[in-house]
Amino acid sequence: MHTLQVLEKKLGYTFRCKEQLQAALYHSSYANEHRAGGITSNERLEFLGDAVLGFVTAEYLYAKHPDLPEGDLTRIRAALVCEESLHEVAQSLDLGRYLKLGRG
């Protein structure tokens, strides 16, 4: 099975645009070493993904907890999307295995 297919199976999601998935896995160190091949880093997708994750999490919490005040919702969202929480999720999915990193 192709590496991206394995990742999709782990995620429980099939990406329509495999190129976007692949681009999301290019670390800036890899992109710098392969710039001549048209490879760009995942930083722009990371920016967009952070915004989408924040929105989806906020929408979920807003619907799930209609009686919580804004401050509580903000604190819960911050805890869910913080670097430590996302690191735990990434480790549980072994995402590092799929990243393309540079040599240096």
Which sequence ranges carry the predicted segments?
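RNase III-family endoribonuclease catalytic core
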Residues: 1-104
